Structures are given as structure tokens and as C-alpha cells.
Design a protein with these regions (language model features):
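Rossmann-fold NAD(P) dinucleotide-binding segment
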Residues: 86-124
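A conserved regulatory-domain signal marking ACT and ACT-like small-molecule sensing domains
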Residues: 33, 329-448
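N-terminal Rossmann-fold NAD(P) dinucleotide-binding loop
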Residues: 39-40
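Substrate-binding/catalytic subdomain of NAD(P)-dependent oxidoreductase enzymes
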Residues: 189-190, 198-296, 301-303
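NAD(P)-binding Rossmann-fold cofactor-contacting core
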Residues: 49-72
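Rossmann-fold NAD(P)-binding glycine/threonine-rich loop
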Residues: 108-113, 117, 126-164
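Rossmann-like NAD(P)H-binding beta-loop-alpha module
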Residues: 141-144, 148-221, 228
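Polybasic, lysine-enriched low-complexity intrinsically disordered terminal tails
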Residues: 1-23
Length: 448
């Protein structure tokens, strides 16, 4: 009996389903794994919209009693089965599993079992897709089911489906932008003069930042998303752990003042570009020219600029954080699977990664002012082949703790780091110098 049911289900999945409004067709049965902010928002979207061909039949949550009695559970159909036993769902006749729990284990194992049993998967799990996406996609293709992950990057911004469907005819050469709403909220608030600690506390209170914010502020969240986008846009399989990251926590309010003098602001930028067999990839705070659209992305807004060889730049922008925007992306993927859309399998090659970009650099020093300091800095930079472009010093600071900024002409970060290593030994240096790359509108990291 089980074999017959499973065979019938697999047959149905290989054919496009009629439009959701045709009641004569059996409903597509859906299970939710996780009922947190995004999971409950997905249930609300399904309940508040007319999707008669979609039936939410199962919900997995580790604390069923608490969730069932919560106000957000009112959007769940009374007939839905709540369970804390994953096998109830894996052994059911569910057609599509929506995974919203996050992390690698035990989720990867559960989804592999779901795929093998003939269930399609929709997920917003960026870590899973960044680290295990290629293997899961291959497994899904082998079992004639689908794996959709449009909500894994930029929440409600359709950057993944946009690249898969709208840009697949172009040859994408570069992508850059903002894919972490938490960091964008923090940095755009600091732009108005607020300090990092205060804004971080506000972000945590608003639910934008976790109690441990390191995944966001140190760039790990954005790194996973950059790897996903690189696989789709650049056809490059990257090891996330090999992608260079830099924290935003060392950026201070004064840096925004200096950035303004340079007609720039500061944002956490994720960027990647193919150069032969290499991919230049990096996540970190950068000075962004005010002439770039990325500079005008505020709050939790995400923005990704995709540069194509033939079509030029395409900008994707919208709210990336929050339950509702992400839920919209999840439900869009769900409907695509239910309507028989195929998940696109693009040719992907494993690529070596370098964090090197040829770019101008912003260097902020804090010193006990003494004669010869600027000369020493210029000498250290000249020794490694880096040329100074400008020197900025704001009035009103005491000489015993004097901040000032040096910007360089385009050079490699590794070159700058050599100079900073020697300068750090000087007694007059009161802090480790802050080094930020400066984004150029016509940036050409392929020359690195």
C-alpha cells in the first residue's frame, strides 16, 4: 500500500499541476519545519491569500504545546497536525517540505530523507545552501523532485529568481551589494552620529540582531549569502570558509565624518568577481561613493547590483529582514513548485577564492602626535609600493590622542597590511589602524 501511494505521488510531481483554482485536483500537501518568526508568517500568508490548491497539513516544532497555544497559531488550519517527531512528517504523504529552522544538523539529514522519499523542498536556510546546496540539488534531481531556496538571500527581494530567470541569458561578471539587513541598519544609524554599541543594542531590542551578533557583524551571514549568489550568478562553487571577512564592529562614528569629506558613506559590502580560474570574493565594511545606488540603501534594506557582460548593471532592492518579506519569498517558491516549475540546474565549477581586490584604501590612525609621524607612514607605504592619495585631519582633537586619515591610490590589501604591520610597532600608535577598502564605481578587481 505504501509503495503504491509513493509511486503515485512521484508520478504527480513530474507533471505540471493545474492552476491552484481548479478544485477537482487534489490539494498540494505542505509541511512546515519550524514555526518561529518566518514560519508563522508563512502560515499567515497562506491563510490570508487565496491558495485553495495548497493545504498546510503538518507543522514540526520542538515545543508544540507552547506554539499551539500562541496567538500566531490562529492562522494554522484546525486540521493541521502539530508534532515534535520529524518522522511523522517524513513518513507522511506530504508533497512539499518547507524548512525554516536553520543550521546544518540535523536539518540536512532530514531534508535528504524527505527528498529520497519523493518530497520537494523549499528552504530559507542560507548556511545549508551555502555549504550543502550543491549536494542537495544533485540529490533532488536524482529523485525527480525540486529544491527551491529563493528566500535564503535578501528575504523578500527576488534576487535569486531574478538571476535564474531574468539574467540567465547574460554572462554575469560581477556582483556586489548589501545582503545583511542587520549591518545595514547599524551602519546607516551610525551615519547620523550614533555610536556602534548604542545602535547594536537598539537592533537587538528591535529583533534585528541576535543576542550574539557575531554572525551578522563579523560577516559570516553575508558570506554564506555571497556564496549562494556566486553559485547562481558566476557559476562558481565557493568554500564559504575561504571567503575573506572583516567585522563592522571596529568602525566608529568619526569614520562616517571622514567618509562624508570623501563624498562617501560606509556599508557592509559583499562582492565577488571571476578572474580566470579565481574568484575574488570578500565581505566587509567599505567606503561607498555617494554616486553609487548602494550608498542610499538605509535601515534593513538589501541591495544587490549584478553586472552582466551584455546587459550591464541590474539592481535588486527591497527589505531583506523580517518575517513577512521572507515569508513572501518562501510562498513564491512554494507556488512555483506546486505549479510544476523546475528548479534550474546551472553548470557550476569549483573555484579557488582570493580576498584580494585592487582598490583605494582608507586608513584611520589614532596617534600621540609627534614630529615625523606622517613622514613615517608615507615611508612605510612607499616601501611596499603604495602611494598616498590624500591626508585628512579634523580639528578639535587633542594632540595626545589625535585621529587622522590617509587614503591611498589603488593597491592590494595585502600590500597595505605589510605597511601597517611595521607601523603598528611605533610607540606613538595608540590603536591598531583601521583599514577599509574603498569601492569604486568602475571597480576592476580582476587586475589584482
Amino acid at each position: 500500500m505504501a509503495t503504491k501511494k509513493q509511486s503515485a505521488k512521484k508520478s504527480a510531481q513530474t507533471k505540471p499541476r493545474p492552476a491552484a483554482g481548479k478544485q477537482s485536483e487534489p490539494a498540494v500537501k505542505v509541511a512546515l519545519l519550524g514555526f518561529g518568526t518566518v514560519g508563522s508568517s508563512v502560515a499567515t500568508v497562506l491563510a490570508g491569500s487565496k491558495f485553495p490548491g495548497i493545504q498546510l497539513t503538518h507543522i514540526f516544532n520542538r515545543n508544540v504545546a507552547r506554539k499551539v497555544s500562541s496567538p500566531v497559531a490562529k492562522s494554522v488550519p484546525a486540521s493541521a497536525v502539530w508534532t515534535d517527531d520529524i518522522n511523522v512528517i517524513l513518513n507522511s504523504d506530504v508533497d512539499i517540505v518547507i524548512e525554516l529552522m536553520g543550521g546544518l544538523n540535523p536539518v540536512e539529514g532530514w531534508l535528504r530523507k524527505a527528498i529520497v522519499s519523493g518530497k520537494s523542498v523549499v528552504t530559507a536556510n542560507k548556511q545549508l545552501i551555502a555549504y550543502r546546496g550543491a549536494g542537495l540539488a544533485k540529490l533532488a534531481a536524482q529523485h525527480n523532485v525540486h529544491l527551491f531556496h529563493g528566500a535564503a538571500v535578501a528575504g523578500g527581494v527576488p534576487v535569486i529568481p531574478g538571476m535564474l530567470q531574468g539574467l540567465c541569458g547574460d554572462q554575469v561578471t560581477r556582483l556586489s551589494g548589501i545582503v545583511n539587513g542587520t549591518c545595514n541598519y547599524i551602519l546607516s544609524r551610525m551615519e547620523t552620529g550614533a555610536n556602534y554599541a548604542t545602535v547594536l543594542a537598539d537592533a537587538q531590542q528591535l529583533g534585528y540582531a541576535e543576542a550574539d551578533p557575531s554572525a551578522d557583524v563579523d560577516g559570516y551571514d553575508a558570506r554564506a549569502k555571497l556564496c549562494i549568489l556566486s553559485r547562481i550568478a558566476l557559476h562558481a562553487e565557493l568554500d564559504p570558509d575561504a571567503v575573506s571577512t572583516q567585522t563592522i564592529s571596529t568602525v566608529e562614528a568619526i569614520d562616517f565624518s571622514y567618509a562624508k569629506e570623501l563624498n562617501c558613506t560606509i556599508r557592509q559590502i559583499s562582492r565577488a568577481q571571476v578572474n580566470g580560474g579565481l574568484v575574488h570574493a570578500r565581505v566587509g565594511p567599505m567606503l561607498v561613493p555617494l554616486a553609487s545606488p548602494i550608498a542610499w540603501s538605509h535601515g534593513t534594506q538589501n541591495m544587490v547590483v549584478v553586472s552582466g557582460r551584455f546587459g550591464g548593471d541590474v539592481v535588486f532592492s527591497g527589505h531583506g529582514a523580517g518575517g513577512a518579506p521572507t515569508a513572501v519569498a518562501v510562498v513564491s517558491d512554494l507556488l512555483a513548485v506546486a505549479q510544476g516549475c523546475k528548479s534550474v540546474q546551472l553548470p557550476v565549477r569549483k573555484r579557488k577564492v582570493t580576498g584580494e581586490f585592487l582598490a583605494p584604501h582608507y586608513l584611520r590612525f589614532v596617534v600621540d602626535d609627534k614630529p615625523g609621524i606622517v613622514s613615517a607612514i608615507a615611508g612605510a607605504l612607499a616601501k611596499v609600493g603604495a602611494n598616498i592619495d590624500s591626508i585628512l585631519q579634523r580639528p578639535g582633537y587633542p594632540k595626545h590622542r589625535l585621529p587622522f586619515v590617509v587614503t591611498t591610490e589603488p593597491c592590494l590589501t595585502s600590500t597595505i597590511e605589510q605597511a601597517l604591520a611595521s607601523l603598528a610597532k611605533m610607540d606613538c600608535m595608540l590603536e591598531r589602524p583601521l583599514c577599509l577598502q574603498m569601492l569604486q564605481i568602475e571597480d576592476k578587481p580582476d587586475e589584482a
